Amino acid sequence: MQKYTSEARQLLALRIPVILAQVAQTAMGFVDTVMAGGYSATDMAAVAIGTSIWLPAILFGHGLLLALTPVIAQLNGSGRRERIAHQVRQGFWLAGFVSVLVMIVLWNAGYIIRSMHNIDPALADKAVGYLRALLWGAPGYLFFQVARNQCEGLAKTKPGMVMGFLGLLVNIPVNYIFIYGHFGMPELGGIGCGVATAAVYWVMFIAMLSYIKHARSMRDIRNEKGFGKPDSVVMKRLIQLGLPIALALFFEVTLFAVVALLVSPLGIVDVAGHQIALNFSSLMFVLPMSLAAAVTIRVGYRLGQGSTLDAQTAARTGLGVGICMAVVTAIFTVTLRKHIALLYNDNPEVVALAAQLMLLAAVYQISDSIQVIGSGILRGYKDTRSIFFITFTAYWVLGLPSGYILALTDLVVDRMGPAGFWMGFIIGLTSAAVLMMLRMRYLQRQPSAIILQRAAR
């Protein structure tokens, strides 16, 4: 019991800064929306449309680079810290290549925006302008993620938190300057949010790079002169590990986007109630997501030390803590669902629907916690390909079709409306949780030599 208690303390120490870093990141998006809305409703809508395209594109690159965390954690645990610098440099090369692809996609996103049904031309122009300003921040964001993953792989999660709040503090005044045109800068409205956010990502990267260069705990890692050439072998391995994670993230983001599109014809009340429940459940998701990041670090580190039993302890402790947290947040959601809905909207019909959907959200919080922590465990074991197959099967083969049938057809029961899609979420997330646990159990039953061999690749 003592080893589980000790492991829980380690996990909580790692996850709290990750939570706060995510809060800072979410707050930046909130600030952009509010400040653009203060300028005009059109500018706020433009930022919202632009963000809906930016997120899938940049999260694909973000997911690809998540492969660095277990690689660095494993090297750190095995005492091969001299190899970390080379891995990080290849991470920067990979981030640079991905940045070019993301920027090309975002530059041409105007074709997607202008093809939207009945979109106002002025709104479309502002959304395109916002994206074309924001895309210059893509390299800064991805370079920052490489540096952050280096720190987190070394079990140092506080720098990411500090840089997140630094970015938030810089974002507010720079937004103000470019939205309203102060200090000789042009008045750009919502497009100014894109300029400010792009600048903030570069500030965060430069600040994180400065920390890494001067941190005493990383002196032994700075052992290569010059930046070095791309290493095709290392980059191929990072892509093999990271691409399934990137695709899994992409499938998850696009699933919720597709459901939002399917709900939109059902009416204003249904759309508003769905959006309230989804926004609140997204806030609750920060808790298990941060724990999953901590579990990846601990499992990778323990495997690097050559201890498969300690890796199992880290995995089981993470699941136990995650389930306990999910039960608490589910009770909180059920108890206060009407009060929470009233914080978003005071329309009685919207509040009633949102409260009903939050009951379903409370049910899936436990499954959601298990599946995201399970994904973190599998990343720690460097078994990322299974994450892709599980996510695709659970969300797109089981969850979305069943949600569509329940919500919009009479094949099984009378049309359920938005609640049908939430039943689909429950089916998809529960399926993912079960499949993640089965895969974890299969991996942990393999001989230690095979587990350690995979982890060392």
UniProtKB/Swiss-Prot annotation:
Summary of the function given for this chain in its UniProt record: Multidrug efflux pump that functions probably as a Na(+)/drug antiporter.
Top-level taxonomic group: Bacteria
Extracellular side: 37-52, 114-126, 181-187, 264-275, 335-349, 408-417
GO molecular function, one term: antiporter activity
Organism: Salmonella typhimurium (strain LT2 / SGSC1412 / ATCC 700720)
Keywords, ordered alphabetically: Antiport, Cell inner membrane, Cell membrane, Ion transport, Membrane, Sodium, Sodium transport, Transmembrane, Transmembrane helix, Transport
Bilayer topology: Multi-pass membrane protein
Family: Belongs to the multi antimicrobial extrusion (MATE) (TC 2.A.66.1) family. MdtK subfamily.
Cytoplasmic-side positions: 1-15, 74-92, 148-159, 209-242, 297-313, 371-386, 439-457
Transmembrane portions of the chain: 16-36, 53-73, 93-113, 127-147, 160-180, 188-208, 243-263, 276-296, 314-334, 350-370, 387-407, 418-438
Gene Ontology biological process terms from the UniProt entry: response to antibiotic; sodium ion transport; xenobiotic transmembrane transport
A Pfam family the protein falls into: MatE
Chief localization: membrane
Gene name as annotated: mdtK
InterPro entries attached to this UniProt entry: MATE_fam, MATE_MdtK, MdtK-like, Multidrug-R_MdtK
Subcellular location: Cell inner membrane
Cellular component GO terms, alphabetical: membrane; plasma membrane
Protein name as it appears in the record: Multidrug resistance protein MdtK
NCBIfam families given in the database record: matE
